[in-house]
C-alpha cells in the first residue's frame, strides 16, 4: 500500500513539475533524408518552420501545426557560413511577394556577415534566392566577436550580439556579452558594408556561454545561450537595456543545446540541436 501511495505521489509531483516547465515538446523534426548540416537558426512564416543549417547547404521546411517535413530548399552552400541565427523582416522585395525577406547571420571566426534571402513560391515548392550580403565591421574594430544579428522591425534596426573577446566559451580576461545597435540598411542586390562608425549604441552584459538564437518582439529581445547542461534564455528590455529575467533552460524543459528561437504569431518556439521543436507555455 505504501508503494502504491508513493508511486501516486511521485506521479503527481512529476505531472506538476511538467506543468511548471516553460517549454513543452511540440514535435521532432524528421526530414525525408539525413540533414546535410547541423541545425542552426530558424524562422516561422506561412505556418511553416524554415530551418537553416551550418554551411548553408539547404533549408528544411516543416509544417508548424502537423510537424511534417514538407520540403528541402537547396542552397549553394558556403563552408564558412554558420547560419547561427535567422530573423523574419517586415520587408518584401517585390510587389506581390507572399513572404518577407529573411536575414541570416553567418557568425564564426571566418565570417561576420548577414545574408538576406528572398523565399518565394508556395508550400512544397518554395525557392530561395540570396539577395544581399551585409558585411559587418571586423570583430577587432567593432569590438564584438562571433556577431549574431537580431532584427528590430518596429524601429528599423539591427542588433548585433557577441563577445568582447575572441572566445564564446571562456569568461577569463573580462570577456562578456556585447550588444550593438545599427540602422538596418536598405535592401538592394549585391553587397553592403556597415562601418564601426555606424554603431548607434553599445551595451555590456555579464558573460554567458555560446550565443544562440534570438528574436525581438514588442520591445523585448529574447536570446538563448549555452550547450547541453549549461543553457539559458534571457529577456532584455530594448529601451532601457535592462535584463528583465533569465531562466535555466534545463529546468524550463529543454535539456539539449538550444539553436533556433522565433515567434509564430504570439507563441515563442525553440528548436534544439537534435531537431526537437519546443513550444513556450507562458512568457
Which residue ranges define each predicted feature?
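Blade-loop segments of beta-propeller domains
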Residues: 67-107
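Conserved blade-ending motifs and adjacent loop-strand segments that build the rim/top face
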Residues: 242-264
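Surface loop/turn motifs at the tips and blade-to-blade linkers of beta-strand repeat domains
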Residues: 30-35, 74-79, 134-142, 202-208, ...
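Beta-strand-rich domains and repeat architectures in extracellular enzymes and scaffolds
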Residues: 28-57
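Structural motif
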Residues: 56-62, 109-118, 166-183, 229-235, ...
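Loop/turn-rich, solvent-exposed surfaces of beta-rich toroidal or solenoidal domains
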Residues: 198-238
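Beta-propeller domains
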Residues: 47-79
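Structural signature of eukaryotic scaffold interfaces centered on beta-propeller domains
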Residues: 35-45, 82-99, 143-156, 164, ...
Amino acid at each position: 500500500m505504501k508503494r502504491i501511495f508513493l508511486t501516486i505521489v511521485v506521479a503527481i509531483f512529476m505531472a506538476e513539475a511538467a506543468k511548471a516547465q516553460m517549454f513543452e515538446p511540440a514535435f521532432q523534426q524528421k526530414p525525408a533524408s539525413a540533414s546535410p548540416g547541423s541545425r542552426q537558426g530558424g524562422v516561422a512564416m506561412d505556418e511553416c518552420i524554415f530551418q537553416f543549417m551550418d554551411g548553408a547547404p539547404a533549408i528544411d521546411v516543416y509544417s508548424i501545426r502537423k510537424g511534417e517535413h514538407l520540403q528541402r530548399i537547396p542552397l549553394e552552400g558556403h563552408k564558412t557560413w554558420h547560419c547561427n541565427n535567422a530573423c523574419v523582416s517586415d520587408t518584401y522585395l517585390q510587389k506581390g511577394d507572399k513572404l518577407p525577406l529573411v536575414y541570416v547571420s553567418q557568425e564564426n571566426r571566418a565570417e561576420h556577415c548577414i545574408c538576406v534571402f528572398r523565399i518565394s513560391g508556395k508550400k512544397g515548392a518554395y525557392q530561395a534566392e540570396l539577395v544581399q550580403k551585409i558585411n559587418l565591421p571586423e570583430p577587432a574594430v567593432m569590438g564584438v566577436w562571433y556577431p549574431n544579428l537580431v532584427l528590430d522591425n518596429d524601429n528599423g534596426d539591427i542588433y548585433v550580439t557577441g563577445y568582447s573577446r575572441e572566445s564564446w566559451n571562456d569568461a577569463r580576461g573580462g570577456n562578456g556579452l556585447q550588444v550593438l545597435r545599427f540602422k538596418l540598411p536598405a535592401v538592394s542586390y549585391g553587397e553592403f558594408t556597415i562601418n564601426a562608425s555606424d554603431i548607434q549604441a553599445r551595451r555590456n552584459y555579464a558573460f554567458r556561454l555560446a550565443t544562440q538564437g534570438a528574436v525581438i518582439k514588442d520591445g523585448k529581445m529574447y536570446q538563448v545561450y549555452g550547450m547541453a547542461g549549461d543553457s539559458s534564455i534571457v529577456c532584455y528590455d530594448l529601451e532601457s537595456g535592462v535584463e528583465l529575467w533569465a531562466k535555466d533552460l534545463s529546468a524550463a524543459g529543454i535539456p539539449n543545446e538550444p539553436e533556433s528561437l522565433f515567434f509564430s504569431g504570439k507563441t515563442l518556439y525553440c528548436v534544439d540541436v537534435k531537431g526537437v521543436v519546443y513550444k513556450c507555455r507562458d512568457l
